Amino acid sequence: VGCSFLVSQELTWNQEVVTFKSANPFSFEEIITNLDNEPVQDVSGILTLPEDFDPNIKYPLIIGVAGSLNWGPHHLKYLKMFQEMGFATFQLQSFDSRDVQSTVGTQTEVTTAMVILDSYRALETLSGHPNIDTNHAGITGWSLGGGVSLYSAWLPLINAINGGKFMFAAHLPIYPPCMAYPYPKENMQFSVAPIHILIGELDNWVPAAACTELIDKMYVSELPINIDITIYKDSHHSFDRVSEVTVNEEGYTLGDCRFPMNEEGSLWLSEYWHIPINKPLRQKLALLTCAGRGPSMGGNKEAREASFKFSAEFFSKYLKK
């Protein structure tokens, strides 16, 4: 626990900045095959305890992970709800810690791999906190953070990071990119902790179809799987924002992108073309084969309310003792 150099909001009495050591692996492959050689990166986040917290109690934890546009008001509203329910929350500051504010249109400065590592390093660090019960810890995130919440359940990554010593008890990915799928099916090795995806029917930034296809592949593998999905009707990317639907000209539309991933976390261009997508330039070239530009994003009142309600019920069910 320490002081941070970058905090995007003023702290209240029940908050503290927690700083820990992480790294900057570009890809899952770099975590699995080369983590010990990655240069150290200082990362911080904001730990918030419930306002009525008792210093003699250990609280269940929810780690929140932002999307490509960094933290927004609707994200913080979820965390506030969780705090009012008696959870401690950790607002991971992966972007600010690397002096990045947005990765829209590039997706290379702060990657899913980096933030998954950050999440587990945070979990390990918080295991030493006297008021945190990391045996009852969940993770949720939006867009890029949804990808973190999803693929942080992939066992080869967990084993490479900490040998399975620290794991999440529940994963709630909100409109995640589901375009990477472990291949062949023997690599579909996920935690048996519950995973539930929330996504919009009309999402063209990260399409729901990729997630339903991934889930189908998981169950076909006949390996232990505990995953489900809710698709909200008439809802775009960022359906839980309080905003009109607009087009983001810089963002990718990932409708047709699907990339197999081997046991070392290396993405290939396809099951037939084993061309690795393991560097920023190769990632950009791969996206040229399947992605467009100009996804839509914006709120849907019914989906937003349903998402908040589901999130509260999901974490209460799986994290409360």
Model-derived regions: residue spans:
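Short beta-to-alpha linker loops that shape the active-site pocket of alpha/beta-hydrolase fold enzymes
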Residues: E51, Q93-V100, P177, S235
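Acidic catalytic loop of the alpha/beta-hydrolase fold
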Residues: L202-V206, H237-S238
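Primarily recognizes the serine-hydrolase "nucleophile elbow" in alpha/beta-hydrolase
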Residues: A113-S191, N204, A209
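Catalytic His-Asp charge-relay segment
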Residues: V192-D203, I227-T230
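C-terminal catalytic histidine-bearing segment of alpha/beta-hydrolase fold enzymes
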Residues: I225-K321
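N-terminal cap/lid segment of alpha/beta-hydrolase-fold proteins
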Residues: Q9-I57
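Short alpha-helix in the alpha/beta-hydrolase fold that links the catalytic acid
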Residues: K77, V206-M218, E244
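Serine-hydrolase catalytic machinery in alpha/beta-hydrolase-like enzymes
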Residues: I32-V43, I57-G128, T289-S296
